[in-house]
Structure formats: structure tokens, C-alpha cells
């Protein structure tokens, strides 16, 4: 497949329990090497009945071999960018911090609190080439609006939670791999957070740096550990709900792809991000590290190396 002749505009990242792309015709598997290594899994290329192409990768690798800290997020995002991806729909299991978000409900978050403690590489811009991206609204607004219209046909009574007027849905990203203490869980609730996971950072930051529209679709599996009358969350608790969540993720994604195809083909999604980062590099051109620029050229081929 020639990526320039046939770009793949939509990327999908699967989280815990979501390791393949059911319901789609897989036509190819690719494993592009990036300056930041290989992605967590080979990327499956699927084609819809209309001919629209989708790229799918498993965040934690085939067989779930990477902890949240170990996920090669830079390679994941860079590999999708190299295929032509303009928008990413990312799925993740989350714990609920609110009574009205029960297990197996879906959430489209609007804000992020980063509690990853700087343990993960979270930028493409380093070692002699500095850029600062705008991250006040960490998810793409246009992509959010389209995905907000999906999910009305989820099974088992599950529903999609989206932003109400003046009410952000905030996801806390913790380091892991251990779950929260009860004190931490209640602290996050006091901050007004809605859900908690271990994956949205640095994924969302890197997508923004790569000028890719990004939205995470969160699938609740538990109430974390803030409910004092319940046992704290365990892997067994999470796995009980992951199977149903995967079935609903397929339903959600099938609907989302249909609604995203036209906006992507028409150049609507991500239009505000194009060249926003590469034109905002702060390092003076003549002082840019050539090795750093060579890495960044994988994302932005038009960047030039200083002479």
C-alpha cells in the first residue's frame, strides 16, 4: 500500500481488552519503524464497504505486554501520523469517580488532570528543538461534537456521557500500574474529576504535537475505590465488564466511522491544527539540533535542517 497514494485518515487505538478491530475487513498489517522505535503492535489496516481506510493499533501490545508506563506512545502516534492519519479515536477502560457513571457506561471526557509524575516521555520536541503546544482544551472540539452524536444504540442499558453546559467531564491520568488508594480516589472526587485511567497522558499531548485531532472514548469498568462499602477495584472486577464494553465499543466505532468519513475526506477535522505546531517552534533555526530535526522530519517532512 502506497501511503501517499492512499492515505489512511482515521486512526483507532484500542485499550485493555480491545486488541483487534472486529466488524471490519482487514486488508493489511504494517509495522513502521519510527525514530522512537516500533509501535506497541503492528497496525491493522481496515477498509470499510465504501473504501474508507482505518488504522488500528493495540496500545498495550498484542497480548497486553506493556504497562501504562511502558507503552511506546511516541512510536504509536508517530506511526499513525506516518500513514496519513488526521484524527484518532482512542478507547480506554476507566474507573468511575461519580455515582451517576456506572460500570459499562461510556464517557467522552473534555479535560485532563495529569498525575503521571513525569515518568513517561511526553514530547517529540527535545534535545535541541523546542516547541510549546496549546493544551488548554486537550481534546479536539470538532471531533468531540461528532462523537457526541454516537452511542445511542449501546447494549445492556449502557449510555454515553457527554459534556453538559458548564460541566466538564475530567479524566485523571494516574501513573499505575497499581490502582489508587482510597485517599487518592476521594481527593480526585473533591477536585470534580469524573473518571480515572492510566493512558490519556502522554497520548493526548503527543497527538496534539503531531497535529492530529484526538478524542478518547472512556469505558467504565468499576467505581475505583472511593465507595467505602465496597472492596477496592481489582483486575477481576475490571475484567467482568471489559467483555461487554468491547461489544459496545464495536457498536460505537461502527457508527463513529460512518460519521467521520465525510469530515475527514473533506479536510474538516484537524484543520485548525495544521502547521500550528511546526510553525510554533521556538528554537532559532540556526541553533536547532540537526539530529532533533531529522527525527521531527518523520512527522513534518517540510522541516529543514540548519546549515
From Swiss-Prot:
Phosphate binds at residues 16, 59-60, 92-93, 199. Pathway: Amino-acid biosynthesis; L-methionine biosynthesis via salvage pathway; S-methyl-5-thio-alpha-D-ribose 1-phosphate from S-methyl-5'-thioadenosine (phosphorylase route): step 1/1. The keyword Signal does not apply. Keywords: Cytoplasm, Glycosyltransferase, Nucleus, Purine salvage, Transferase. It catalyses: S-methyl-5'-thioadenosine + phosphate = 5-(methylsulfanyl)-alpha-D-ribose 1-phosphate + adenine. The record marks 180, 235 as: Important for substrate specificity. Its EC number is 2.4.2.28. Pfam families: PNP_UDP_1. GO terms for molecular function: S-methyl-5-thioadenosine phosphorylase activity. Homotrimer. Catalyzes the reversible phosphorylation of S-methyl-5'-thioadenosine (MTA) to adenine and 5-methylthioribose-1-phosphate. Involved in the breakdown of MTA, a major by-product of polyamine biosynthesis. Responsible for the first step in the methionine salvage pathway after MTA has been generated from S-adenosylmethionine. Has broad substrate specificity with 6-aminopurine nucleosides as preferred substrates. Belongs to the PNP/MTAP phosphorylase family. MTAP subfamily. PANTHER family: S-METHYL-5'-THIOADENOSINE PHOSPHORYLASE (PTHR42679:SF2). This is S-methyl-5'-thioadenosine phosphorylase. It comes from Schizosaccharomyces pombe (strain 972 / ATCC 24843). The lineage of its organism: Eukaryota, Fungi, Dikarya, Ascomycota, Taphrinomycotina.
Amino acid at each position: 500500500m502506497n501511503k501517499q497514494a492512499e492515505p489512511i485518515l482515521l486512526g483507532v487505538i484500542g485499550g485493555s481488552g480491545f486488541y483487534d478491530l472486529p466488524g471490519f475487513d482487514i486488508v493489511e498489517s504494517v509495522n513502521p519503524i519510527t525514530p522512537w522505535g516500533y509501535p506497541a503492535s503492528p497496525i491493522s489496516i481496515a477498509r470499510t464497504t465504501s473504501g474508507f481506510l482505518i488504522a488500528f493499533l493495540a496500545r498495550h501490545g498484542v497480548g497486553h505486554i506493556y504497562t501504562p508506563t511502558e507503552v511506546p506512545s511516541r512510536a504509536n502516534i508517530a506511526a499513525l501520523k506516518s500513514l496519513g492519519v488526521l484524527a484518532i479515536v482512542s478507547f480506554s477502560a476507566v474507573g468511575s469517580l461519580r455515582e451517576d457513571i456506572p460500570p459499562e457506561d461510556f464517557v467522552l471526557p473534555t479535560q485532563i488532570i495529569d498525575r503521571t509524575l513525569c515518568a513517561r516521555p511526553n514530547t517529540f520536541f527535545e534535545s535541541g528543538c523546542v516547541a510549546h503546544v496549546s493544551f488548554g482544551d486537550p481534546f479536539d472540539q470538532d471531533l468531540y461534537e461528532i462523537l457526541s452524536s454516537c452511542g445511542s444504540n449501546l447494549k445492556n442499558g449502557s449510555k454515553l456521557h457527554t459534556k453538559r453546559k458548564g460541566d466538564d467531564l475530567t479524566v485523571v491520568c494516574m501513573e499505575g500500574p497499581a490502582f489508587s488508594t482510597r485517599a487518592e480516589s476521594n481527593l480526585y472526587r473533591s477536585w470534580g474529576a469524573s473518571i480515572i485511567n492510566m493512558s490519556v497522558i502522554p497520548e493526548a499531548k503527543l497527538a496534539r504535537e503531531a497535529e492530529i485531532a484526538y478524542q478518547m472514548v472512556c469505558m467504565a469498568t468499576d467505581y475505583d475505590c472511593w465507595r467505602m462499602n465496597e472492596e477496592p477495584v481489582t483486575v477481576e472486577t475490571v475484567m467482568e465488564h471489559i467483555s461487554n464494553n468491547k461489544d459496545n465499543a464495536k457498536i460505537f466505532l461502527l457508527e463513529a466511522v460512518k460519521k467521520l468519513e465525510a469530515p475527514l475526506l473533506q479536510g474538516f477535522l484537524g484543520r485548525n491544527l495544521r502547521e500550528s505546531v511546526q510553525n510554533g517552534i521556538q528554537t532559532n533555526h540556526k541553533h536547532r539540533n540537526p539530529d532533533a530535526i531529522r527525527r521531527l522530519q518523520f512527522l513534518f517532512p517540510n522541516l529543514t535542517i540548519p546549515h
